[in-house]
Amino acid sequence: MNGQRGTMVVSLDLELCWGRFDKVPVPMLEADASEERIQIRRLLALLDRYEIPATWAIVGHLMLAGCSRHAGAAHTDVMPRPDYSWFPKDWYVHDPCTSAIQSPGWYAPDILEWIRATRVRHEIASHSFAHIYYGDPECSATAARADLTAAVVAASQHDVPLRSFVFPRNQVGHLDVLRAQGIRAYRGADPTRFRRTKGALYKTLSFLDQLLGLPPKAVRAEEVMPGLWNIPGNHFYMARNGVRKM
């Protein structure tokens, strides 16, 4: 637009079982996680082959080698929890509180090492600690702060500084919490007009978008707070399965 060259940012959400436990049965998630591990290795090889660096936004709990329960509860140090009316259980109800060897869908420090061992230098970003939804009105600032603090601590165990953030389900919220923890950039909401709709209309328009292969529009990074930048996502890559094979 002004003669300057653009930059393409490839950001990948690494969440395994943490990404959908509120929607999908755990046995199915764990089976999917096993397949995801295979595909992650293939993707890393491709990125190396074509010398493409990516931002890997990792759920912080995956960086743990394991965890255990205290007084019958998981992660009593990560308090308070978000108080979602649509998920009345404890957020960690499905956390196996075992180890990466026993539960590789819930812990993945090995995948972190795969990423760091590649020839291409990738960025490690945060995707929260336990995939809570910061932008949900029922997620308080104190809950977001506790979650992000836990993510920073988990990353520090691997000497990984966190400077970028990807919101779970792309629900943006509590930007002041991010900035206070040293986050400098986050992936913001897609500015495409139809992506702001909800329900059946969104699903219909999204399907047509995928079917027609409409090109994404260029976006600009925006400094939303001093030292904190919004880099909007503008193209969501989907697996070619089901009707998307068309």
Residue ranges and their predicted role:
Residues 1-164, 169-231, 246:
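Catalytic alpha-helical scaffold of carbohydrate-active enzymes acting on polysaccharides/glycoconjugates
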Residues 231-242:
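Positively charged, amphipathic and often flexible ligand-engagement surfaces
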